[in-house]
Amino acid sequence: KFRGWGNFEYLFFKDQVFWDTFQNTLFYSAGSVLITIPLALLLALALNSQSLKLKPLWRLVFFAPIVTSVVAAALTIKMLLNDEFGLLNYGLSFLGIEAISWLESSSTSKWSVMMLVVWRWTGLTSIYFLAGLQFIDKTLYEAAKIDGATAWHQFWYVTLPQLAPVTLFVCIIVSIGSFQIFEDVYVLYSGNDVPLHAQSIVVYMMQRGMEQVRLGFGSSIGVFMFICILFISLIQLRSFASNIDEDAKKSIFERILVPIIDFIANIFPPQSSNINKKPLSPLIGKWILNIVVSIIGLITMIPFLFMFTSALKSTREIMAWPPVLWSSNPNWDNITTLFTKFPADIWIFNSIIVAFAVTLLTVFFCTLAGYAFAKYNFKAKKILFLLMIATSMIPFPIIMIPLYVLIGKMGMMDSLMGLILPFVAPAIGIFMMRQFISAVPDELIQAARAEGAGEFRIFWQIVVPLVWPGIATLSIITFVQSWNSFLWPLIILRDDANYTITLGMTEVFAL
């Protein structure tokens, strides 16, 4: 039934719960940007430093959360934060601090979610900065050094400006990702029991739109989210495009934080620069660098260690106080029970089918489409490309309800096909492959055509081998995202025989 503007009227003027969840979402978004991005930048500088020992090991440690299922990560963090047997409260007890109800208290619940978000996203964000650092011309640092620039000035006037495009991309990605936060909150609070003081706007949209079958009202929330995300992106684009004048460079930020950043910049110098002026001796700087990275790395590893050790503990050992770090009698029955009491083998098989199908179809169609956009001229090419790029700016929760209705009308509810088709050939994948294929010399393609090669043969035997790094990158990203997908399977799957492993884990923990 057509309701005109009724859904928006109720949303904006009569629904106080919506505004409470909106404030929570703004907190998650702002916290993600202000905490994750600076931390990821410092981490990237450290991982790029020649002074860092065991660099491959630390890169593996910090990047591991990227490939960890959000369900597994959230369940582990939930146990670490438990107010009765959690490891965090145990550590605070040595400082004389009483146990904190991290998830139940309104003053700490959002910070608990932020712990999970920062742990999961910092490694991925640092990858972008680390990649950007590799493309900075090292002669810029040498020229700055000759001019007498300190480490701080090299960082402020060389590194940051050169990283501006990457920083813009990261800010937009982190803002959009945190604004549509769902899995972190949903799993931490056992599904539908999310308290109002921790609810995100997507959790609220899920409850009202899907569970209460108010699809029109849920769609109005999606439209509001799209406007907010577009507004945030435009502000960031405008702020990065504006020039920084001299007064801004002498802001209170610089006057107060110059000594701190100068200290950090001397510990984390650019990889190829030799800075003459060093407040710290090289030996002290190297020791501090390695100690700090080791501490952060160990903190990052705590959820993994707790996850693996808990798999071999009994329920009594998991809930023991003080916490039992390692079981003296490993309980291997936990693993066998997973496959005897639950159809875990079917869930894993379903995840493999879905992940491989989505990956293969995505790589095939994205590479073909990227080849067409990069090497062919046809009518409305620019318009189609811009429209495609525009769709990549629309987060999934915004189209979730219309897609749910469409899949239902196509008869694909509660099926693996319904998990596969919506995620084949995403716009960001087409854009990525277009960028890789654009670097292929046109002369090779023209020479192959002159020899009588067909278009598909040119694509398969010339283009594909040359863009194999791009294909590998797209394959890894797509497979990991598909394997860890949780929100969409949660919406359309009902029969546990069709569950993926991420959704099945919630069944094991009775979420």
What is each model feature region?
Residues K249-L280:
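Membrane-interfacial, low-structure loops and terminal tails that flank and connect transmembrane helices
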Residues K1-K249, S281, G285-L511:
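A structural signal for multi-pass alpha-helical bundles of membrane permease subunits
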